[in-house]
Amino acid sequence: MVTEKTLERINELYHKSKAEGLTDAELAEQKQLRADYVKAFRENLRGQLESIKIKNPDGSLIDVKARHDEKMKRLAEEQAEKGN
């Protein structure tokens, strides 16, 4: 989980890099903090997308994740058939 303190540190390192440059240790810290931030962002986005349901005109609900998984399975099967 990314905290407000982590975001402040990311921004602090960014501004310092533009103003005067970073040490090797600060560059490594910046890289790790950014990687952690991107990972948390992606996990959060994935969680939101997986919980979305689409309502059809007939009133039925479709789970977006299940629909996506079915589509990916179909595409994989089609590619496997083309490969044979």
From Swiss-Prot:
Where does the record say this protein resides? Cytoplasm
Q: Which InterPro entries match?
A: DUF896 (IPR009242)
* Entry keywords, A to Z: Cytoplasm
Kindly state one GO CC term assigned in the UniProt record. Answer: cytoplasm
Q: What is its main location?
A: cytoplasm
Classify the source by domain of life.
Bacteria
Q: Name one Pfam family in it.
A: DUF896
Name which cysteines form disulfide bonds. none
Tagged with keyword Cytoplasm: yes
Assigned protein family? Belongs to the UPF0291 family.
Kindly provide the name given to this protein in its UniProt entry.
UPF0291 protein EUBELI_00985
Species for this entry: Lachnospira eligens (strain ATCC 27750 / DSM 3376 / VPI C15-48 / C15-B4) (Eubacterium eligens)
